[in-house]
Regions:
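Secondary-structure end/capping motifs
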Residues: 219-297
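Ligand-binding clefts/hinges and TM-proximal coupling segments of bilobed small-molecule sensing domains
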Residues: 134-151, 231-262, 301-305, 314-317
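Conserved C-terminal helix/tail region of periplasmic/extracytoplasmic solute-binding proteins
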Residues: 287-319
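Pocket-lining segment of extracytoplasmic ligand-binding domains
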Residues: 84, 163-253
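Boundary at the C-terminal end of the N-terminal hydrophobic targeting segment
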Residues: 16, 20-22
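Positively charged n-region of N-terminal signal peptides that target proteins for export
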Residues: 1-4
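Short, glycine-/small- and polar/acidic-enriched structural segments
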Residues: 22-153, 157-160, 166-172, 176-182, ...
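Bacterial N-terminal signal peptides
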Residues: 6-16
Length: 319
């Protein structure tokens, strides 16, 4: 008995002196609504990739502009929103885009029964986009003129910051058309709405990835590297694991198994190969966005993008 008690005391002492290492929190600005780009991060949570890197991922849903403002202020560590992030950088915000998910927009311009074709929007019909200056707003202003519509005169672009609010606005008639994600497009079609055009057929554009504050990138490089290593693993997992990815879509996007599989097939072709884009693509994005945002100054890719860590991680993993 004495021997047993001695062993118990020894075990308790061992537990008492064993250090407990707290995970480092990573506050991540996400769009919400169960979009595929958001689910890349969620997959890393479910698979334990962030915890393997000593990180506790804290996804925080916020509007695109407020989330980027929080990132600039240091209230967020990372943001998923590449389009709004790039716009902020071009205006002088101290941020960098350090990883890219999509190379073409996975968005659809959707309308309900009163609008039959794109030309029917002419006459000040309301079109729901995201924050003014954000990716969806920029893309819409670029695409509409190709189809004979002046975004300033022929339609009224309405800012609906949260992506999850655009589908309800469309279904209730608050707007005549809305730019929706793959998930919400399927839901809208089930309610009798129809697609006017697919943005991915119209142009190249980056809307999702990882944006970070320059100070964090400089002063906490190991933290950023661990976060990106986990995110890169999550990105690869999401692209190649249809069964697991569709299960997450069903959980967060409230989709049926068939619809989730459809969404996965819709978005995979637009994703980048390794989390980066080549320099000529970076230059095209800068030219497009500076024109849309009416920014008249010389901007080179190094002022917007920094893929050095992701490039290093790809070499490290042999990908």
């Amino acid at each position: 008995m004495k021997t047993f008690l001695a062993l118990v005391v020894f075990a308790l002492q061992a537990v008492a002196v064993t250090p407990v290492f707290a995970l480092e929190e990573a506050r991540l600005h996400i769009s919400g609504g169960g979009s595929p780009n958001e689910l890349i991060f969620r997959s890393g949570q479910h698979e334990g990739y962030y915890k393997q890197e000593g990180i506790e991922l804290l996804p925080i849903v916020a509007g695109m502009l407020p989330g980027i403002q929080a990132l600039i202020a240091g209230a967020m560590d990372f943001s998923q929103i590449g389009g709004q992030g790039a716009g902020a950088i071009l205006r002088g915000a101290p941020l960098k885009i350090v990883m890219i998910f999509d190379t073409r927009p996975a968005n659809w311009l959707v309308c309900c029964k009163s609008i039959q074709k794109l030309e029917d929007l002419k006459g000040k019909k309301q079109v729901g986009v995201s924050s003014f200056g954000a990716a969806l707003d920029q893309m819409t202003r670029e695409i509409l003129p190709k189809h004979g519509l002046d975004p300033q005169r022929d339609v009224v672009l309405r800012s609906i910051t949260r992506s999850s609010d655009r589908l309800p606005a469309l279904l209730t008639g608050s707007v005549d058309a809305a730019v929706l994600s793959a998930t919400d497009t399927i839901k809208a079609k089930e309610q009798g709405c129809h697609v006017l055009l697919f943005y991915g057929d119209e142009l190249e554009f980056i809307s999702g990835g990882v944006v970070v504050n320059n100070e964090t990138l400089t002063k906490r490089q190991d933290f950023v590297r661990r976060f990106l290593r986990a995110t890169l693993k999550s990105f690869r997992w999401f692209k190649t694991n249809e069964k697991g990815a569709t299960a997450l879509m069903r959980q967060y996007g409230k989709l049926s198994a068939a619809d989730a599989a459809t969404v996965h097939k819709m978005v995979i072709p637009i994703y980048s190969r390794d989390g980066t884009i080549p320099r000529n693509f970076q230059e095209r994005m800068i030219a497009l966005q500076t024109a849309n945002l009416k920014i008249d100054k010389k901007i080179i890719p190094e002022m917007v993008y920094d893929f050095s860590i992701v490039d290093s991680l790809n070499r490290e993993s042999g990908k």
